[in-house]
Amino acid sequence: MEGVVLLHKPKGMTSHDCVFKLRKILREKRIGHTGTLDPDVTGVLPICVGRATKIAQFLTSETKTYEGEVTLGFSTTTEDASGEVVETKNVDRTITRMEVEKVLAELTGTIEQMPPMFSAVKVNGKKLYEYARAGQEVERPVRTITIHEFVLLDDREVFEGENISFRFRVTCSKGTYVRTLAVMIGEKLGFPSHMSHLVRTASGEFLLEDCISFEEIEENVQNGTVESIFISIDEALSKFPKMVVDEKQAEKIKNGMFLKNELEITAPFITVFDKNDRCLAIYEHHPKHPGMLKPMKVLVNNQELKL
């Protein structure tokens, strides 16, 4: 049993919770996720199973897309709906569509963002949420992120009420905290705010419409069709350039054999396949020997090569 499962992560579970539950359903210990989603967030969570756990780092896409909702009128400790209320301020004026779109435009492009205290970012070897739970505030590192697209999905021309909510879609770089974007929107509009809803609709080439639920996975296990839920390792790595080696080279790859870059591939990672179209390893350019490739991740061992 191996491959990538595109899980539609439910609300209320951590990414680790999802891995733990899948281990029980699939009766497989070698399972890992490709990046954390907050408990309140639903949507695309690629999960690697079996030998596919070796490629998890290559499936952590640089670009993610989310659809969410920001609510103005109060902020929370966690910057989302799960936290305790920190500040309240009634929205005492009408906010126009033009105002909101102007703010979203200002937040599009390369910007700086400070991660929230309730996050897994490490400071001095300790995760920020550990400081937050202990009631400690520490200096947080500012990170540079890229917002590729920030679109207002709500079709209203004006927003009125003590608490105002509106929906958005954002495509952003890896490491972006969307709940912090919700706070930044509120700051620019002059009101405390938080992210009241969020779903990840895409992680790189993996889309929400292709994801399956825990219930669907369990149904496939019971029906004996569990293999149908997996994206193969080869398919998951199809975005990378491909080299094919002969049987003799395939035997040596497991021992870390260097390869000549005969195809003059310039991409940072190259997948290496045998003549049976099985991915053996992922290679990268050798830093000291131009024109040579060195193994970054070997996916087969002696036993697997004999299969």
From Swiss-Prot:
GO terms for biological process: mRNA pseudouridine synthesis; tRNA modification; tRNA pseudouridine synthesis. Belongs to the pseudouridine synthase TruB family. Type 1 subfamily. SUPFAM superfamilies: Pseudouridine synthase. The active site is at residue 38. The keyword Transcription does not apply. It holds the Pfam family TruB_N. This is tRNA pseudouridine synthase B. The gene is truB. Keywords: Isomerase, tRNA processing. Responsible for synthesis of pseudouridine from uracil-55 in the psi GC loop of transfer RNAs. The keyword Iron does not apply. Its EC number is 5.4.99.25. It catalyses: uridine(55) in tRNA = pseudouridine(55) in tRNA. PANTHER family: PSEUDOURIDYLATE SYNTHASE TRUB1 (PTHR13767:SF2), TRNA-PSEUDOURIDINE SYNTHASE (PTHR13767). GO terms for molecular function: pseudouridine synthase activity; RNA binding; tRNA pseudouridine(55) synthase activity. It comes from the Bacteria.
